[in-house]
Amino acid sequence: MDNYLFNFCKNLETVWCKNQVDRIGIQTFGVTPMERLCVNAKNIDISAFAGMESLKEIHFRGGVEHMSLGAFAMLPSIETICLEGIDPDVMEDDWANLGNSNLTILVPEDTSDEQLEAIGRKFLSSMIITDGAQVKRGTCSMPEDPMPDIAEMLSAYGI
């Protein structure tokens, strides 16, 4: 997904991708009204989600090879970031200055203590969270969204 692909799309509520994408570029989802987002991408660029003022939860599926922590800048409503099997070594420290004491970072139950601490250090050093205890083991609760009925959507436009 190229840089600025959905940037400032004020009516964007849902994005559905069947398979993993190679990249989510700079401000791909910037300033959109989505409240929840599920990401399945290999690379996540800086400011990928910047300015999503309504975003409350974001879920990252496994397979992330590079993630700029600057992707989380300017997310005032964020409550949950779920990391499903992401190695802390693929996270690039970047200044996000979110400093959100109400944010929970969820990692899988089988995450080792060392990985848990490493993830906490990364999010702390990028000033996304205020306390390493905000990184917790748990289960993500975002269900899989079913594929939309494309024919039904097109019929609304007479196609």
Language-model features, listed with the residues they occupy:
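Terminal, low-complexity interaction segments
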Residues: 114-123
